[in-house]
């Protein structure tokens, strides 16, 4: 008998109890004419979700429920299809009828979401983050698993396959990942990674959409594009360092980079995000928010020109990467120091009238439940052709590890405090 849990569908983001889960028939046998022995259905719920017509999918059926299941939890055992009698244990969302992985149904589906405006570097960041987490996660006893979530008959859309392709492009071919076209309005599959602590068994899911980014100039667009945001236990907001006016001025004066693809200004992000949360998801003010400035190597390598103190980032004569990569322990004081340094720059030298307001708004809305981070997905600036001499991600895991530390249950051991369970 499984524990009764509330589930959030990774496709439509409607909630349901796992006792309400539907089953999809797993019978793949065909008759002499090549037809499935368990006839496929043109499913209204599935087709409505994907905005298509006539797509045939596996037969979905409601399992038999015992009288006490509503009190004790669902069995989640194999059930025989009501059409062909084939034993199945493949679960489907009762709302959109998409396949939901069994571990989500059994263990729950708490999520951390990653959002960011167009050209913020969100896709490059998530690939670098997952690459580093798979490489160093064992130091924190964390296991990361890309999920096999995809539309029926489209396994190429799974997180595992999509991530592998982009990981190879970035870390083997040394090529910046292609930008997603802003006009691409395709209903996309979310990237979903399961994060699990090997000792406490605490599980959470990192959810990310490989789209052109949320339009933070428009609250209705945020509401439509990031419906999952309001159900998140924590949020990583990717901000483009190059979108800051003062940074743009300095970069242009040095001729360092083409700024034609800068992201949404942070003041627009702050205003729209705050309005969305205040109107539709007030509980998010109680959840940890990591404001992550991407492409931060631009600042660190030109700190003197940008009026930025690098003391919080240096260890002797070189930039210090995250402490847990070597020690397995999280340096809370270092995270505080970095956050305070970035906030100080936003309020002073980088302030162009709006940056300080963004900081004060974050402090008013989230208090101790927010931090600022500076990360680099590449560790260097790419060429105009998008080529990289090497790829050495810098501090990309910090925002996620900090959120896990704040949430508790992941046994994140620290240098400065007693370990927090």
Can you name each region flagged by the protein language model?
Residues 1-105:
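Long, basic/Gly/Ser/Thr-rich N-terminal segments
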Residues 13-16, 212-214, 241-245, 296-299, ...:
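Conserved nucleotide-binding/hydrolysis micro-motifs of P-loop NTPases
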Residues 104-105, 134-178, 416-417:
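Flexible phosphate/Mg2+-sensing switch loops adjacent to catalytic phosphate-binding sites
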Residues 110-136:
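Glycine-rich phosphate-binding P-loop
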Residues 121-122, 334-349, 379-418:
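Conserved GTPase G-domain signal focused on the G5
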Residues 197-200, 223-365:
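Conserved C-terminal guanine-recognition region of P-loop GTPase G domains, centered on the G4
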Residues 355-382:
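Beta-strand-loop-alpha "switch" segments that mediate conformational coupling across diverse proteins
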């Amino acid at each position: 008998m499984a524990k009764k849990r509330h589930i959030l569908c990774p496709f439509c983001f409607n909630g349901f109890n796992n006792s309400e889960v539907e089953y999809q028939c797993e019978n793949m046998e065909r008759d002499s004419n090549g037809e499935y022995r368990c006839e496929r259905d043109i499913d209204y719920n599935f087709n409505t979700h994907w905005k298509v017509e006539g797509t045939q999918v596996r037969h979905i059926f409601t399992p038999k429920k015992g009288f006490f299941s509503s009190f004790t939890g669902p069995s989640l055992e194999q059930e025989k299809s009501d059409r062909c009698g084939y034993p199945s244990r493949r679960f489907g969302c009762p709302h959109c009828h998409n396949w939901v992985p069994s571990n989500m149904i059994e263990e729950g589906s708490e999520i951390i979401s990653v959002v960011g405006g167009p050209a913020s570097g969100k896709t490059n960041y998530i690939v670098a983050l997952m690459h580093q987490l798979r490489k160093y996660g064992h130091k924190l006893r964390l296991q990361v698993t890309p999920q096999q979530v995809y539309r029926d008959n489209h396994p190429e859309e799974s997180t595992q396959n999509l991530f592998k392709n982009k990981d190879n492009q970035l870390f083997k071919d040394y090529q910046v990942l292609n930008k997603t076209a802003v006009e691409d309005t395709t209903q996309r599959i979310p990237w979903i990674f399961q994060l699990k602590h090997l000792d406490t068994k605490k599980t959470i899911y990192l959810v990310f959409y490989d789209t052109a980014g949320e339009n933070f100039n428009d609250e209705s667009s945020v509401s439509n594009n990031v419906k999952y945001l309001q159900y998140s236990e924590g949020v990583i907001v990717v901000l483009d360092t190059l979108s800051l006016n003062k940074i743009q001025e300095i970069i242009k004066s040095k001729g360092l980079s083409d700024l034609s693809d800068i992201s949404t200004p942070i003041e627009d992000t702050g205003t729209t995000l705050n309005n969305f949360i205040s109107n539709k998801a007030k509980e998010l003010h109680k959840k940890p928010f990591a404001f992550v400035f991407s492409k931060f190597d631009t600042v660190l390598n030109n700190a003197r020109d940008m009026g930025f103190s690098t003391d919080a980032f240096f260890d002797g004569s070189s930039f210090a990467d995250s402490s847990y990569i070597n020690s397995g322990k999280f340096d809370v004081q270092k995270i505080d120091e970095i956050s305070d340094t970035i906030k100080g720059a936003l309020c002073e030298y980088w302030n162009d009238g709006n940056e300080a307001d963004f900081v004060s708004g974050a402090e008013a809305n989230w208090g101790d439940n927010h931090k600022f981070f500076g990360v680099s997905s590449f560790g260097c600036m790419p060429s105009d052709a998008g080529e990289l001499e090497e790829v050495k991600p810098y501090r990309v895991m910090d925002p996620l590890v900090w959120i896990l530390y704040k949430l508790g249950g992941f046994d994140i051991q620290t240098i400065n405090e007693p370990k927090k369970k």
